[in-house]
Amino acid sequence: MKLENIKFKAKRLDNREWVEGDLMKESYSARIIEHTSKADNWIAVDPSTVCQFTGLKDCEGKELFEHDLIHFAGYNNTAEVIWSVSNCAFMAVHENKHSYLLHYVIKICKIEKFGNKFDNEK
């Protein structure tokens, strides 16, 4: 992944809208500064909603972030994008708990992002 592709998104504390940019995480809080903002314009975000950009895109060119939900075209499967510490990679974790390397799945399947676990909670 290129250095300029390292970015995060999270939900703002003030209005629950998504904000993207650079992350500053402290012991009990997190802040994001948008790439278009001044250096002193940090936005307080909910630390539990912080998602890192994977550096990958779906079949429609939508950027894939950690905790995004994806659908496999031609299959009745959905998965969540997660970071795996043991694999040091982003994984697609199916509802049936099987997991696959995300960069591999994108090469062999047509996948489409349809939301994320924070906006599509059951």
PLM regions: where:
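Secondary-structure transition motif
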Residues: M1-K122
